[in-house]
Amino acid sequence: MSTNDEVFAKDNEFWKTYLRGRAQPPESFFERIFRYHEDHGGHFGTVHDCGAGNGPYSQKLRSRFKHVIVSDVAPGNVELAKERLGNDGFSFRVARVEDFDDIPTGSVDLVFATNVMHWVEPSRGAKAIVSQLKSGGTFIAAGFGPARFEDQKVQDIWTRISQSGGRRLIMKADDPTKILKVAVRSSRYYDVAPTDTSLFVPGTQRIHLNMNNGGLTDIVYPEDYVAAAEPSYTGPQDDEIFESEDGWSFETDLEGVKDHFATFPFSKEDPEVFAELWAELEKYVADGRPIRGCWPAKIILATRV
């Protein structure tokens, strides 16, 4: 992996696999966001879908907003989004979440950042979001990447696969320290996105869904997590909420787990490293038992002052 941008540049086949192998958020996910936005006096003019990939959620945002800005760091992803979504109510830009000079100050009603904020340096990301949001606008960040399996043996093997893959991704990065921080942010309780009360209304909601048995599966070993851990971005006035919610569970088989694996950047790194772990999992589920689990999800909802 020579640059971070290469991690994000994906072709159409990858996005087909991504839709098979990742959570498809239930309607309640979007209803929660729209309800929060409406309850806090937000308008439904412009929404910025940042770090959008090929825009899998952009059409849902368009169902409520007049204009959707779809942006991603990878030009190929933006082209795929443009081909699929068209220009009716959509505009497109190639940019990082941190890049905001071309977005007029205070012009966006809602910033939607799903499965991307762990890649963003927290203070720079906050500056970009604050600049573009209108007063009373909504910032929503969410993370629902790694699955969590009901069977503890399956979960144990999956954790070892994830940690092994994460370490190799870090070792091959141009900037291993930066990628280690990304991996730490994307694990456990997805502690991202500072919302300083001088910039956001006190009471940011940090909602943990389906985390009774743990948060997002770690993609770093415990010793690496401790070494790279950042200060918590959960403020003293934030509202931490823990809930169970229907619509995030799944039942799959070994091929389904492999589809999930294929959605992670480390899936193409040294495949022989994972051979023994896959053999262990294949032997364990050889009797045809279904593999059940859920998608833990973190949702952060904040209102600009």
UniProtKB/Swiss-Prot annotation:
Induction / repression: The cluster is expressed in rice fermentation medium. Expression is correlated with the production of pestheic acid. Three regulators are located in the cluster (ptaR1, ptaR2 and ptaR3), suggesting that the production of pestheic acid is controlled by a complex regulatory mechanism.
Gene3D superfamilies, A to Z: Vaccinia Virus protein VP39
Enzyme class: transferase
Protein keywords: Methyltransferase, S-adenosyl-L-methionine, Transferase
Source organism, top-level taxon: Eukaryota
CDD domains membership: AdoMet_MTases
GO BP term, example: methylation
Pfam families per record: Methyltransf_11
Physiological role: Methyltransferase; part of the gene cluster that mediates the biosynthesis of pestheic acid, a diphenyl ether which is a biosynthetic precursor of the unique chloropupukeananes. The biosynthesis initiates from condensation of acetate and malonate units catalyzed by the non-reducing PKS ptaA. As the ptaA protein is TE/CLC domain-deficient, hydrolysis and Claisen cyclization of the polyketide could be catalyzed by ptaB containing a beta-lactamase domain.
Entry protein name: Methyltransferase ptaH
UniProt organism field: Pestalotiopsis fici (strain W106-1 / CGMCC3.15140)
Organism ancestry: Eukaryota, Fungi, Dikarya, Ascomycota, Pezizomycotina
